[in-house]
Amino acid sequence: MAAACPLPRTPDLPTLHDKLQGLLSFLRGALAISSAHTVDFYTKSVWQELVDLPPESVLAALRESAVEAEPREAETGSGFTELPKIFCETSQKLLSVEAFARTAKHYSVQNLGLCTPSEQLLTALQGNKRQRVDENVKAIEFMNTKKSHEVQAMSELICSIADYCGLKQIIDVGSGKGYLSSFLSLKYGLNVYGIDSSNTNTHGAKERNRKLKKHWSLYHPHSRADANGWASERPRELKVPKGVECKGDAESVQRSRLGNPDLSATDGLPDFSGSAISVIRKQQKNVLAQPAEEENLYFEDAFSLIDFLPVDAIEPTSSQVQNTEKSGLRKERRNTASKARDSSIYSPLTSFITADSQLHDIIEDLEDCLMVGLHTCGDLAPSTLRIFTSKAEVKAVCSVGCCYHLLSEEFENQHKDRCANENWGFPMCHYLKEERWCCGRNARMSACLALQRVAVGQGLPTESLFYRAVLQNIIKDYYGISKCEQHVGKIYSKCSSFLEYVRMSLKKLGLDESKVSEEIIMDYYENYKPRMNELEAFNMLKVVLAPCIETLILLDRLCYLKEQDGVAWSALVKLFDPVQSPRCYAVIALKKQCDLG
């Protein structure tokens, strides 16, 4: 049950408000940079409008800033950098890159002192029963390094919270392919409901879990589920109301936007897939050699993962078959574990989750539970927190969000037609609601950039974005279209030259290619090529700002939890290595009914 140690102290609401006040003061000047759409970089003279410095000096200053130490303790006050030194008071243009970078670094989650160390929290939750995840759980056996890192770190924390609060039931919202859910049930013997809006994900998770259970004992015969006998103690099936699995129709799947690999809203943002801080690159070659989802700015939860099982677990090689046949011990382990797990303790369900969802309609045998989410997309993360605060059965929550660009904003003009009492993704807390604060889609999109993976000064792959920005100029000048509603998509990777890129793009957009000759197209390219460094420098400014936008979103969620009377403890925890998993912060909260030591 509960650990003897009290949970770590966390910042109170007045302290968080002070942090927010300083952050908002900085963002009022800096938000214009994050909000600028790089597709319009040349058509709207973005560099000239927002930056009063040559691009070479900006890039040089950011390179130097990247290797500087963290802000000194004496500089950590809210007024350590006067804003007029960063931005011009009259034109609002950026004047000092050094001050800009230093202030942005100061207002990151980590440097503001908002995080509760994960080791400290685990020690408090587990007390004298501290047990790390078995070292024999090798990443290669299940998934790629990134996903394995996330699942193992989060599952240990979830199990510790469940033990601390005396909970056996876990609800995994936005469960996707079921990696976390399967691990929680098989490794820790927890009763897990994995809820996703996509029938495809649900059926895939069921099949994957079925195969995994058959082979689990062969690879991990000493899991907690076997050791404590939980699986065999629960002969009953998980109860699911009839028809729940069929709720994930095409409309709800599209509304949820979960697992959609075709999102085109990120056109015009740089592809940073080949970048990482130079020092980290040497240490993390095995990580960066994999496809990087989040810094590509496509769906952060639409991971390109290998199957959950080892490659040879489904189709063993001949030598492995012989070894298995010769090993009576392995056969016995496999048969014993198979009998113990005849009743599944992981049930994938299909349902579209909102803040107003009635859990009893989805889970028939709902009991006191812990609600979790690993990289829950857009509004699903704030909805998870609202369900936690409003449903008596949900005693604790552990949520890692992603896809900030898909959040709905209450004070964004484009949403005027929505109901006033609707649950918005941002803001959640009273402080930001009173400020009527709005980030805007482009700023939220820039918050998805991964600063830790970007090598300052190492040469960003900005050519694709440069192509798109110059194309926009051609479209404006020759077709009279100042705002193109259609998206070009991933044409750049299919083209060998700017000329081919323009031709393919115009065709996709349904524009008459004959209006622009080859000579005209190449003239545009040659005229703007010397200004490509402006685009590179501007993108780096956006990357440096990205953690500040994320800090604002996370602070909003933490403040919301602090405002709730029924919440006894809440915190931000840096759960993952940001190089492996840029969306690394978990929002955690426990209700007063939990024993807090």
From Swiss-Prot:
Region (Disordered): 245-265, 317-342
Ranges annotated as biased composition (Polar residues): 317-326
Superkingdom field: Eukaryota
Disulfide bonds: none
GO molecular function terms attached to this record: methyltransferase activity
EC number of the protein: 2.1.1.-
A biological-process GO annotation: methylation
Top enzyme category: transferase
The entry's keywords: Methyltransferase, Transferase
Gene3D superfamilies, per the entry: Vaccinia Virus protein VP39 (3.40.50.150)
Classification via InterPro entries: Methyltranfer_dom, METTL25, SAM-dependent_MTases_sf
Pfam family membership, one: Methyltransf_32
Sequence ranges of Basic and acidic residues compositional bias: 245-254
Function field: Probable methyltransferase.
UniProt-recorded name of the protein: Probable methyltransferase-like protein 25
